[in-house]
């Protein structure tokens, strides 16, 4: 283990990563650099500095990455209308590439020869962190303590703290929630405890960001989201930064009971796992983006995007953000967004997001052609006869050759 001289640790300041920091110092006899990212998780990150200093750490990075997170990771993903297995908006998955990127950048800045993370050996995050790290710095060494040590429970972690005099305050010792949680500006997730039984309904006090739809206001809330090149740029006519837009949508969505999902997903490592997620702002953005695309995207371009989306979602879920194929797909997706400009009006009511209006200077919707009234010759209905005959030709030939579908067909 002596080949490692300096390691950059993804550090939250909590129990697990505080133990990891000390463990790295003891087991690898190396210098530890800590990196703490503010991705909008709703907790103060600055206390991580004092905790790291108490462990004798001299190089401490604490960074506000909220704008970069939303601008360069969340928004590009939403341009593709990305959703995994029909329900998961990838709130955890999309945060890992940014953390991996900064770990490697800091390693380069500080001359570190390794990085470390606190992901367990059972989950997807270990894969996401490490695939990203190897893509960005092929020769980097990755230390994953949960795959090496024998500290397998909270009790053993606490015992390690006491043995090595690791300063962990009372609020860290006290387990505030029975669930394993992860949060950033896009979502908050819950796993473990009673959720490990997929038949058990979550207790209502588990949810943090949203009221239950039953307790949401009895009057709807209307909002308008402005789009430029596929990205939201304003709410109710007020221009906002990417992070502010998502923060605002989280608040208004949560107040209206929007964004709760309870799913069993297929993890990349092979197991099924249940997770509950609150993604109020993301749920609104997904609905709004599809609405503005519905009037600005050509039919075949829209259908091609829909065909690509599950593959794109799987790439992100499995940790391949920094892959050539994701970059290729992103280029195609971004090209499709050139004319995705305009405004969407939505009604938020008791857990539901309903599109009630959409408009764009780049709209392909032509009321003169689509009207059920007299179109003044804009659309010649007689043209449909030839169109139908040509599209039916292959099926007519098959039927004539005996490939019918009725019981009496031979």
Curated annotation (Swiss-Prot):
PROSITE patterns to which the protein is assigned, alphabetical: ARGININOSUCCIN_SYN_1 (PS00564), ARGININOSUCCIN_SYN_2 (PS00565)
Entry's localization field: Cytoplasm
Binding site for L-aspartate: 120, 124-125
A GO CC term assigned to this protein in UniProt: cytoplasm
Catalysed reaction equations from the record: L-citrulline + L-aspartate + ATP = 2-(N(omega)-L-arginino)succinate + AMP + diphosphate + H(+)
Pathway noted in the entry: Amino-acid biosynthesis; L-arginine biosynthesis; L-arginine from L-ornithine and carbamoyl phosphate: step 2/3
Biological process, per Gene Ontology: argininosuccinate metabolic process; L-arginine biosynthetic process; urea cycle
Record HAMAP family: Arg_succ_synth_type1
Protein name per the record: Argininosuccinate synthase
Species: Marinomonas sp. (strain MWYL1)
Taxonomy of the source species: Bacteria, Pseudomonadati, Pseudomonadota, Gammaproteobacteria, Oceanospirillales
Gene that specifies this protein: argG
